[in-house]
Amino acid sequence: MEDKNINSKSVETSRRRFLKASAAVAATAGVLGVSSVSGLLASTAKLSISTNNLPIKVAGYKIDRVDALIDGRVQIEGCDMQFEIASIGDMNTNVFSGPQSYDVTEIGLHPYMLAYANDGFRGYSMIPVFPLRLFRHKSIFIRTDRGIKKPEDLRGKKVATPGFSSTSLTWLRGIVQHEYGVKPEEIQWVISSKDSSAKAAGKASKQESVIPQGLSVSNGPVGKDESDLLESGEVDALFHAAEPRAYVEGHPKVARLFSDFRKTERDYFAKTGIFPIMHAVAIRNDIIEQNPWLPKAVFNAYSQAKELMYDHLKKMAWVTTSLPWIAQEIEETRALMGENFWPYGIAANRKALETLFQYSYEQGLASRKLTIEELFHPSTMNLEEAQV
């Protein structure tokens, strides 16, 4: 009887140990997102392989088309990625005159063009991923008491700008010239010493302050930002990439030149097919030389992240966005611009890129007219996204 009790206790102890061990295995499998012991073993093998991945540091804005990279839903194949949220001025400065601590980084398209053409910069190569694009008609602000009703009325006027050669300002001058016939030399430019949006944009790189020959350009008073100049009447209008303080605060004599800028910008796209590009993605060339597969892997990851954004917009944007008519906005955008209205790749963006190359050269900013083939890594020339 005593032996039977001992055996029963031993069996019970063994059973408990087995159940405890099984629970531990199941818990570990759950953490790894697998549903079986065999899945756990496979995941463990995968984890051990991942130690051979390339560690890379990526920088960019926190924006919906990149969110899946930031939160880890999308990974760059073959890489262990660390994503750092940064502002464009700081990213530009890091690349052109700083420590180049980012292996992959969002970059201002026009500052990169100027660094490449004018300064012989070759530290990074761009890939045809464009995290930020923006129609720019909305970015012209005026004093309402200066008789400015249309772009042609800017002739002879004083127009303030924070900086001069940023991507946004280069697009703006080009659009005003080619769509409305007002050349940069017909305007009196005043560069403000401060920018009311500097906290959001970060420190401007030197490539954003290139002043060409042959224009009427003066510096605004020290200590005054662009909004001070517009509010005081020292200038008649303002070109600004963001929303200037004077407009945000509702100054009674400050307005947009195009009050219905949505219609104006939609008409511009219908006419030209151009969705202006502001930022691209660039990769350090020494990293590419050692890992020639990386440009394609980065392109694919950004494309996958954008696909998740599209899917969210179609299904759930009305939940996560505070705009009450967001669903109609999405539908109308797709009707005008297509399902993939934010395209990556060279083919879909060739016209927009070459238009900015033209604007930069004819405005006296880039020392020569650049080409797509020299600015973008050769391995990315024919990369295409999966169909939306």
Language-model region placement:
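N-terminal secretory signal peptides
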Residues: 1-17
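C-terminal segment of N-terminal export signals and the immediately downstream linker at the start
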Residues: 11, 34-59
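N-terminal export signals
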Residues: 17-40
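Short, glycine-/small- and polar/acidic-enriched structural segments
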Residues: 47-51, 55-198
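Short helix-initiation/N-cap motifs at beta->coil->alpha
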Residues: 84-95, 187-228, 374-381
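Pocket-lining segment of extracytoplasmic ligand-binding domains
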Residues: 197-314
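Secondary-structure end/capping motifs
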Residues: 282, 287-362
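Long, low-complexity C-terminal extensions of enzymes
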Residues: 345-388
